[in-house]
Amino acid sequence: MEKINHFIELTRIKRPIGYMLLFWPCVWGLTIAYDFSNNIQIFLKYGVLFLCGSILMRSAGCIINDIVDKDFDAKVSRTKTRPIASGKISVKHGLLYSVFLCLIAFLVLIQFNMFTIILAMCSMPLAFSYPYMKRFTYWPQLFLG
């Protein structure tokens, strides 16, 4: 059970601000684009898909960030207890978990149209470059969009 808690901690699911920052722009876009004379269940379906995708991709991104920053995190009091930095979870297991979350997120993504799928796939290099951008700029969040 302790190992499961470390994997939950790795995703930062208990800190919702990260996935909400992904989710709200999606819902705003959906609300602006949606024709509410259609069935509201379709709107709700896409809202739930956006929420699931936001949680999954933010979680995968946190894991990649922890893998890239593990040596730095181990030296900083605020981050030294993170599961990868502290050695509670190996880099290999963290990477496998991140890939697993990305695969589930892809299953969510393919529920959308082809334009959305292509746009999302094109944004992936930007999202996963974030941990590296912290080494070159004071504004790495610009690469997240």
List the predicted regions and their residue ranges.
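Cytosolic, membrane-interface loops and tails of multi-pass inner-membrane proteins
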Residues: 1-7, 62-89
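Membrane-helix interfacial "entry" motifs
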Residues: 2, 38-46, 79, 112, ...
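N-terminal membrane topogenic signal
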Residues: 3-18, 92-94
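Intramembrane alpha-helical segments
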Residues: 8-9, 82-145
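The first (N-terminal) embedded transmembrane alpha-helix
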Residues: 13-32, 145
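Hydrophobic positions within alpha-helical membrane elements
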Residues: 19, 63, 71-74, 78, ...
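Membrane-embedded alpha-helical segments that form the functional core of polytopic membrane enzymes
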Residues: 27, 31-68, 78, 102-106, ...
